[in-house]
Amino acid sequence: MERRLVVTLQCLVLLYLAPECGGTDQCDNFPQMLRDLRDAFSRVKTFFQTKDEVDNLLLKESLLEDFKGYLGCQALSEMIQFYLEEVMPQAENQDPEAKDHVNSLGENLKTLRLRLRRCHRFLPCENKSKAVEQIKNAFNKLQEKGIYKAMSEFDIFINYIEAYMTIKAR
């Protein structure tokens, strides 16, 4: 009886820990997920880019370099968390007409994060990214303008995600 219970528990643990995307179909669905992100962003892009009065880029080349380097995993994870926890909640409150679209964009980003975690080769990380820390500091210094800046550059973020996933897929 005890042995069966142990074997059953081991099987359950393996099923729980095994990535959902063990087959290639689900791990290869990232291009469609990026298209969905771009499509969702296109619904609010004009609103946020017209309100963005800051000339300097928030998402600098150093972030892309982190994405391409050994910190890629952590940089991507931190940036997704940054957008989901700091940028999007504030962006939803900028315009009632944009709220649902920003919410939809956030849901697409959450889905992507979940899929990346389940396809472990894309997010096996634990280090900190200096570029992300700099972005967060610049964002906070911009105060209310930071929302428009971060949201107006979301397409750059999607491009960086795509670059990261292209490298990891090799």
From Swiss-Prot:
Alphabetized InterPro entries for the sequence: 4_helix_cytokine-like_core, IL-10, IL-10/19/20/24/26, IL-10_CS
GO molecular function: cytokine activity
Signal sequence range: 1-23
GO terms, biological process: immune response; regulation of cytokine production; symbiont-mediated activation of host anti-inflammatory cytokine signaling; symbiont-mediated suppression of host interferon-mediated signaling pathway; symbiont-mediated suppression of host pro-inflammatory cytokine signaling
Similarity comment text for this entry: Belongs to the IL-10 family.
Principal place of residence: secreted
Entry keyword set: Coiled coil, Cytokine, Disulfide bond, Evasion of host immunity by viral interleukin-like protein, Glycoprotein, Host-virus interaction, Secreted, Signal, Viral immunoevasion
Binding partners and assembly: Homodimer.
Disulfides per UniProt: C27-C119, C73-C125
Glycosylated residues in this chain: N127
Coiled-coil intervals: 97-145
Name of this chain's protein: Viral interleukin-10 homolog
Phylogenetic lineage: Viruses, Duplodnaviria, Heunggongvirae, Peploviricota, Herviviricetes
GO terms for cellular component: extracellular space
Domain of life (superkingdom): Viruses
PANTHER family according to UniProt: INTERLEUKIN-10, INTERLEUKIN-19-RELATED
Functional note: Plays a role in masking infected cells for immune recognition by cytotoxic T-lymphocytes. Down-regulates the expression of the host TAP1 gene (transporter associated with antigen processing), thereby affecting the transport of peptides into the endoplasmic reticulum and subsequent peptide loading by MHC class I molecules. Inhibits IFN-gamma synthesis.
Compartments, record wording: Secreted
